[in-house]
Amino acid sequence: MSRYSYQSLLDWLYGGVDPSFAGNGGPDCAAFLSWQQRLLESVVVLTLALLEILVALRHILRQKEDGRGGRSSQPQQVTQRPEEGKESLSKNLLLVALCLIFGVEVGFKFATKTVIYLLNPCHLVTMMHIFLLACPPCPGATVIFKLQMHMLNGALLALLFPVVNTRLLPFELEIYYIQHAMLYVVPVYLLWKGGAYTPEPLCNFQWALLSTGLMFFYHFSFLQILGLVTEVNLNNMLCPAISDPFYGPWYRIWASGHQTLMTMTHGKLVILFSYMAGPLCKYLLDLLRLPAKKID
């Protein structure tokens, strides 16, 4: 018999999930909502998510066809430097740092037998960031970049309403905050590089709509089904987090509303911040420089 049987594999994936921690999982968490309410919410949200995906794809593909004749609809891109295309030192250092941070987080998941939590959206976005830093600029990287720009709202929620009651290992809590902070560092860095990492215009919400539909479809289909089968509260699809301000039987309805609003606007605010931060930093640096004295 193989040493790693099917049962040991399941134990390796979620055997360390302790239902005694509030909001972590277990039978009580899985039964937090009645099956009728869960089914009704899932049907409504999945239908809306599919409509959002179809509408967004239709407009994006139409814009792509219209853009073949010219680039007038594209935003102004950062002036490309002569060394554009070469791996910069800063990009490589950021990639190494992110890989080390995420590697430690993965190690914690293996050590605590909670590897299943790597399916949570923040970890998936971190993997997308590693790909963007490692992959040369290309059309595929541009698509992933535009999608992840509108998937960063989870990092804000994780920082404002942290769920850290299960992080008991040394430095596990610190890695939690560092990883979620890095979810903002990488996009802002890529925005400053420009080129293939140029977002859509601020008035264009099609990519935000597509990201919203994909995130809700992922949550109410894959994460919810897997959570019900394993009784693991993946991204709070079974029961609300202990820090949820909308704790109660309608927490998913509230979440669908405020997360739709956040997904549609949060990425735009990050883009706007990156546009303002660059000139602001340059202005502050110019202020710090002492004026040169003219010698007659």
From Swiss-Prot:
Family: Belongs to the TMEM164 family.
Biased composition (Polar residues): 71-80
Transmembrane segments: 40-60, 92-112, 125-145, 149-169, 171-191, 209-229, 261-281
Annotated signal peptide: none
UniProt main location, coarse: membrane
Originating organism: Mus musculus
Protein name: Transmembrane protein 164
Catalysed conversion reaction: 1-(1Z-octadecenyl)-sn-glycero-3-phosphoethanolamine + 1-octadecanoyl-2-(5Z,8Z,11Z,14Z-eicosatetraenoyl)-sn-glycero-3-phosphocholine = 1-(1Z-octadecenyl)-2-(5Z,8Z,11Z,14Z- eicosatetraenoyl)-sn-glycero-3-phosphoethanolamine + 1-octadecanoyl-sn-glycero-3-phosphocholine
Localization terms from the record: Membrane
PANTHER family according to UniProt: TRANSMEMBRANE PROTEIN 164
